[in-house]
Amino acid sequence: STNEVAINLIKEKQKEIGCVYADTQTKGRGTHGKTWVSDKGNLFGSIFFPLKDNYPPFNEFSTINPIIISDVIEHFCEKQKINLKFPNDVFVNGKKICGILQELIISNSRKFLIVGIGVNIVSNPNTKSKYQATNILLETKKKPKIKEILDLIIASYEKFFVDLNSYNYKHFKEKADLMALN
């Protein structure tokens, strides 16, 4: 999984911040140990960064991450209904299009947040879940490049950290409540 690669980069290579992605994953995973189906042409990536003293606490990132990622999805799925199923799923038109796996690790007495992101771009799994899955191509007839989505995710996190002085959890929480899947 890309989260495992990120963990290795932090622990073994002492990388502070970064992004990794793969064309496919053989050991992709979701929450509660579920496997993440990894069809080529979709996005499988992880970003990671240290949780510095001036950053929001870890638990707030379970609201922040889906908002940041859903804003990116919304960019590619304009005029589509975007919802969130907390803490880790983004839905378009009532169908799951993205999964997020947030992990906290400690390395050299420092906390690091790893955000694993899977976005269905060109295909989606046939799940036995109560939630149907979809992909960007199916919903919009557009096929954005993986790098295009990844670059926007990175830029969105960079903007979040640059604007940290004006960070207000209440803003994220209110938006999250409005986007919650009923």
Segments from the language model and where they lie:
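Long, positively charged amphipathic alpha-helical accessory segments at protein N-termini or as interdomain linkers
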Residues: D53-K81, V92-N182
